Amino acid sequence: MEEEVAALVIDNGSGMCKAGFAGDDAPRAVFPSIVGRPRHHGIMIGMGQKDSYVGDEAQSKRGILTLRYPIEHGVVTNWDDMEKIWHHTFYNELRVAPEEHPVLLTEAPINPKSNREKMTQIVFETFNAPAFYVSIQAVLSLYASGRTTGIVLDSGDGVTHVVPIYEGFALPHAIARVDMAGRDLTDYLMKILAERGYTFSTTAEREIVRDIKEKLCYVALDFEQEIQTAAQSSSLEKSYELPDGQVITIGNERFRAPEALFQPSVLGLESGGIHVTTFNSIMKCDVDVRKDLYGNIVMSGGTTMYPGLSDRMQKEITALAPSSMKVKIIAPPERKYSVWIGGSILASLSTFQQMWISKQEYDESGPSIVHRKCF
């Protein structure tokens, strides 16, 4: 038995939960952050029906369940369900006893303070962890890309945020957060598919639309041009087979859905697109650091995985930036999990070991210690 106990790293996204051991290069467990409850009463006695299902099991039985995501826009809205997800992570996915390992969790920037305190409380009181730390997601993504300076555009399922970081410090006054991400794009795709005559209504059918989005959507370099191309020929059309064997065809919906990232007004949101948000964030930073930020725009999270997104981002930011400025978009291939990878790197650093909040410190100070130790 080695003397070092591996820390557990859990990146609780609004859509997927990524969990594993510090020092690994990829998460061991990746499963949907879903808790499902049966819609109907069981009639077969002795089937051992559960009153709730978590993750992949909820996903596979979705036809008879009502699916709920306990994390909305990066903030935990249902703590009972969240506890179920953590319980599932420790005991079923990682098969570890949480009282034996330090636990690193992640959160979105500009989250309510109470959210962090409650997280801390549950980890120490329900799961009896020996040590705990909570880190900001975008900062971890930057670690994973091997940089200490850059601006991270982190867009997942529930929240998108832009965080400028200089020499390892997030610049809090310039952090921008947009409550528009993958889930909103899925909803928007549901809506525009309905206009084509394909209706998806239940929580289970929404998962089908999410799959269509992940497999077929892309970002157009020139939106107007692409709309014309789609109208004139069927070259952009793709077909998708539904679980029951029916085949549907989708055309301009393929790029109209992700276009909402650049034109949130189609979702009825007032915020600027991700390119404008990134540019504004850079402009809020000191004039001396801007050059380094323009040259290190790091993509992170599942919603940045669309083909064509980096090129479009490059084009849009270059148009906004001063003409002589060198703009560089960094899109690491493993960016879907870069937050987790950054957490794995951080938790295994020898210099990090004195940063943990210990159970003893927690017992002395209570949950508010998280604001003093984690920033």
UniProtKB/Swiss-Prot annotation:
Actins are highly conserved proteins that are involved in various types of cell motility and are ubiquitously expressed in all eukaryotic cells. Keywords: ATP-binding, Cytoplasm, Cytoskeleton, Hydrolase, Nucleotide-binding. It catalyses: ATP + H2O = ADP + phosphate + H(+). InterPro entries: Actin, Actin/actin-like_CS, Actin_CS, ATPase_NBD. Belongs to the actin family. GO terms for cellular component: actin cytoskeleton; cytoplasm. The lineage of its organism: Eukaryota, Fungi, Dikarya, Ascomycota, Pezizomycotina. Its EC number is 3.6.4.-. It is found in: Cytoplasm, Cytoskeleton. It comes from the Eukaryota. This is Actin. It comes from Neurospora crassa (strain ATCC 24698 / 74-OR23-1A / CBS 708.71 / DSM 1257 / FGSC 987). One of its GO terms (molecular function) is ATP binding. Pfam families: Actin. It is an enzyme of class 3 (hydrolase).
